[in-house]
Amino acid sequence: LINGVLLSSLCMVANAADNVAGAGSGVAIGTGSSAQKDGVVAIGKGAHTNYAGGSGYAKVNGDVVIGENATTHSYYDQSGSVAIGKNAYVENTIGKQDKFFAFNQTNFNSFGFGSLPQKPDKVVTGVAIGDNTYVRSGGTMVGSHNYRGKIGDITVNTDTYAEKRKAGLGLYSTTLGSNSFTNGTVATTTGALNVISSNYDGNNIANATRNFGATINGSLNSIESATAANNYSGLSNTVVGTANRTNNSNGSLIFGAGNEITNSITDIDAGAITPGLFGGPSSVTKLSEDVRNLVKDNKSGGSTLAIGGGNKADYTQLTSMTGVNNTVTGTAGNVAKLNYVTGYNNTITNASNNIVMGNDHTITADNTIAIGGLSSSETRSVANTTTIGYDAKASVEGGVALGYKSNATVDKGAAGYDISTKAASTDTSSTWKATAAAVSVGDVANDLTRQITSVAAGTNDTDAV
């Protein structure tokens, strides 16, 4: 009995709470914990607040750190951070970006890099809640982050501070969801297993424009800019749904599942969102206005839209796809532009200025209008054609087919019938000789003809009667 009591007592001692007082003038509980300022709380083994700057500012308080090795690190006495969870980390930086987003809440002591806020408590800080979370100034990250492996175009490792930092260095970024990662200024990810990736590592400010304002809402989505060649990749991309992807694209909009937009990108005049020597906009309202003007002035970047499922665009600009399994592709030297596609299983390849509504159309020429479905897939390789109706076809450039199964096959240059000579006219004027392909309302080769009714008398010699 005595041995049992002693053993029980030893177990209780071995499992006792780690309530060892830590260091600092704040509230610090836990072995190796540290709360360096009054009004700061650090609870947990190795939990600590760290202030690298020596501002001498009196109002340095409000940081809350709870969890094993949870940390807030402020470069210059910024305060108000929250880090909750094992290895949660908040890094409050000082630099041109931080000054740009200060919105005149405080003055800085110099221009450009190295300028320090006169009132550090007026500079925004971060909130990280969940194991292995990491955010920079102004950021919010909530959720468990223990994934190690490939996601989008990067490989993440949440084991170390340095690796976590690579995936989440965007200022004012927001991540809500387990094992999602956001590296973009004012970028937002909501949902699990998403990524907004960048090669921005805090050094090359030119890379910081990647993913500015990018947004994901859903799961298994990726906005990939880490491997992109263009520093404006990801800017203003919006993805809503499941398993969608953009890569090396800006101004892209995706709503649905399984859609892909790649290489839909233009260079952007990003002066309005690029930190300079003299800080940034005077207010959030002004920044919002600046971004609206940037979007308008730059024609929304690559500006490709995909709504539905399984749509794919590559090397496109100013393109819209609505429906399922539509594909629009160009090349680096021949970008497909100004295409509008709605329906199912339509394809546009190396062509621009097309309107397709229906199913199973394959377009390889410019300036085509195809409205209506097809009973089987067909390739349109001649330009400037218009077909309206189910199974309507046009096989000559500029041909027009109107109605079910109509077929435009008569090319320009056909001479009109001269009743006076009872033969084709020899007059080569446009009155007698067509300068564009014919309009067809049937297919005489397949015994399909139509009357055209309710036609008024013509005014000119070239009017139908």
Tell where the protein language model's regions lie, with residue ranges.
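Glycine- and small/polar-enriched repetitive beta-structure motifs of secreted/surface proteins
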Residues: N3-V465
